[in-house]
Amino acid sequence: MERISRVRAVVLLVIFGLIISFFSMKLFSLQIIETDGNTDNTTTFTTLTRVKAARGDILDRNGNILVGNRASYDLVFNHYVITSSDNTNESLYKLIKKCQELGVAYNDHLPITATRPFEYTLDEYSTAWRGYFQKYLSERSIDSDITAPLLMENLRDRYDIPDEWTAEEARAVIGLRYEFDLRGVANLSNYVFIQDVSDENLSAIKELNTPGLMVESSTVREYHTKYAAHILGTMGAMDSDDWAKYQELGYAMDAVIGQSGFEAAFEEYLHGTDGTRVDVVDKNGTIISQYYANVRDEDGNIIGVDSPKAGNNVETTLDLNLQIAAEDALADVILWLQNPETNEEEAGRDVEGAAVVVMQVKTGEVLACASYPTYNPITYNEDYDQILEQDFNPLFNRAFHAAYPPGSSYKPCTLIAAMTTGKYEVGEIIKDEGVYRKYEDQGFAPKCLVYTNYRITHGDIDAQKALEVSCNYFFYELGDRISSQALDDTAKALGLGEPTGIELDETLGYRANEETKKLLYAGTINAGFYTGNRILASIGQDENRFTPMQMAVYTSTLANQGKRMKATFLSRVVSSDYSSLVYENEPKLVSTLEISDDVYKTYVEGMKQVISGTQGTARETMRGLDVAVAAKTGTAQTGMQGSDHGAFICFAPADDPEIAIVVYGEKAAHGSTLGQVAKAIIEVYFDGDDEIGEVAYVENAMG
């Protein structure tokens, strides 16, 4: 009997031991494998970390990297670890003080001012961030109408902030506590405390041993050239409109996107796909294991891992050598004009801004594009406040967004309209009488510029001579002969006032026609488009307003005998490792204006004489070049005090065009002087000559 009792006791002990072992193993499973960090006695935490994908490079047509990435470090919090530590507030307080001591900015998205009197700053945040804030209040059962000061009192109690801390100290720590809680409320990835921290500051901060603060490898956008600022573009955080668009594309709310230039235009190619990493850490923040999360199909089958995928590389049509030549030459000419010691004439000294565009005639590829004044994209963030204070708005991209009157550079368009409609025959002579008196009895009698300045005329001239000397009288007569519709149709077919197709945002400008007059002067006596308007439009005045980019398309179309190509900056897209072609851009023909060989020869020969003729308005500009150039100068009245605007268009070689160049200067006085910029570009393009000659101001050059 006693033996049986002992056996029963042993059996009971074994059963009890098995029960204890079972629950011990279950508890181990809960703590080690399945913990979510919600209990105080957990020993590990499993979190998901978004791993940012590297952005693709931007290159020029020769493979030079214009914008790339450099390796950097971010400081990221595992919020489970820091909030489970014994002295969360004190650790955060020390961390914040160290950052303030080092002058290091950190991320804090609590929409309340940092100092008293506390006020909301919701207007500074996107719709998504404002939504997260409201969700936070709801999850914490806090009235959404609560004032900022009352909310600060509420959160101070909620997070057990010591009474002896100042309101500002409390606000700083509460900002971080809010970030931690937001991760659980809104299911966000780990909180990035500091981005791109320097090695020195990283070492100083790591010495604090702040629980849960981890170092993550990352990348930062880096510009490799001080040139092309207006077209390379900038990066920035998303606003509410951006978020509405990119959320559907899988972007994280705090993703940085292209805001302007190439960065914005080619966002779809450059942006990579972020990955998701699983981190298992102990209560001290020590990493136990890390791996990328599995990707499953609709049936739950594992089909891969969610690792980051770098963005593709974009090869642009830009030629960095030509870009450098264009920007340097443009700056040289502007500074030359502004300097009384070099520019002895007063005209042009008040020059303000300028732009230049270089385009490949047969493809529409933009080889260079510059706007003056400019800025250094490498130091853009540091210099931003100073840039805003500079004269003439360096941030304004004049090549795309400034619409100017073309002046006499428009005259080839008028000639084409007259010849293609049979209103002017090859070789026909028109006598310049100085004053166009046909409508004098109606109060309209425009003058030729040489008559205005010197009381002389050009006499009997044909179309080629009229282009050479830029005779306004000749083109007044052509403008009177042709219909408004014929002139407008020709200008449109040549690309003036039309979208260029360029990937960057652009201003459309407008052509001088009946529709434009009604639009600009609705309800006034100036709303009509009369004969006088058409005659002035024929020399590039009246309401003609075009961007330098549109003028580049126009000039290329002239060179291409009426074939208008889509303007583009995109050459091709290749994979992140350069091993495969993703997309190759092909030249696109937009439209064709039928221009006969006789018409083409007439205006090309006339434009050649602008350079080579004895009276050419730019005869001194291209002196010394080995390549023949077809050009047209332009002087456009501004209707304001100061110098006239200046324009210069050309293509080369004249007999088999490869490139078209447009230079425009605000209050530059004469287009002929701007031809110096084109000359420098042509020298580099054809000769590879980086030496830019001295600026030569051409006196008495009109057009």
Per-region residue spans from a language model:
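Membrane-proximal periplasmic segments of bacterial cell-envelope enzymes
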Residues: M1-P308, N343-A355, V361, G422
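A generic structural motif
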Residues: Y80-V81, G665-A669
